[in-house]
Regions:
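N-terminal targeting signals for export/organelle localization
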Residues: 1-35
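A short beta-strand-turn-helix
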Residues: 38-55, 85
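Short active-site neighborhood of thiol/selenol oxidoreductases, capturing the structured segment around
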Residues: 52-65
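Hydrophobic beta-strand anchors of alpha/beta hydrolase catalytic cores
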Residues: 57-58, 90, 113
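Typically the conserved alpha-helix immediately C-terminal to a functionally engaged Cys/Sec
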Residues: 67-84
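Non-catalytic, surface beta->alpha helical segment in thiol-disulfide oxidoreductase systems
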Residues: 74-76, 109-141
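Structural microenvironment flanking redox-active thiols in thiol-disulfide oxidoreductases
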Residues: 95-102
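A short glycine-leucine-enriched loop at secondary-structure breakpoints
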Residues: 104-108
Length: 141
């Protein structure tokens, strides 16, 4: 190898390393596991709420929602959020496959979070991306 090729080889190795590690980080974020024990049926969540006395945390989401996808690898994978969520019956509502509750609660933005009574009465609402520390603060109000 000639000395004039060394800088090209070194730069090439650096570019390849950065591209590889960047791809790994994105893959990990996309495949992070949610640790919230989501229910997927609002009526069942209401029944559980009546039995336990815990209010319902309703999370309205969609597969095409970028902030919702980011929350999978951040907020919903965070242990402090999981701990704060133990005071609630968490239910995840896909707006595309569950249009009835989406319409009933007039959900217009993704993601939307509602705190509901056991009868389904809305008590609090918030919309948009929430990182773990913001979610915990909101849940503890």
């Amino acid at each position: 190898m000639t000395s004039s090729m060394r800088p090209v080889l070194v730069i090439g190795m650096i570019v390849l390393s950065v591209a590889t590690f960047s791809g790994v980080s994105e893959w990990r974020a996309a495949h992070a596991k949610e640790i919230i024990p989501w229910r997927d049926d609002l009526a069942a969540a209401q029944a559980e709420s009546r039995q336990t006395g815990r209010p319902i945390f309703a999370y309205f989401t969609a597969s095409w929602c970028p902030p919702c996808q980011k929350m999978k690898s951040t907020t919903w994978a965070d242990n402090t959020v999981k701990e704060a969520m133990q005071k609630f019956v968490p239910v995840k509502i896909d707006v595309d496959s569950q249009p009835e509750p989406t319409a009933r609660y007039q959900v217009r933005a993704m993601p939307t979070y509602l705190i509901l009574s056991d009868s389904g009465q809305e008590q609090r609402r918030r919309e948009g991306l929430m990182l773990p520390e913001d979610m915990v603060r909101w849940l503890e109000k």
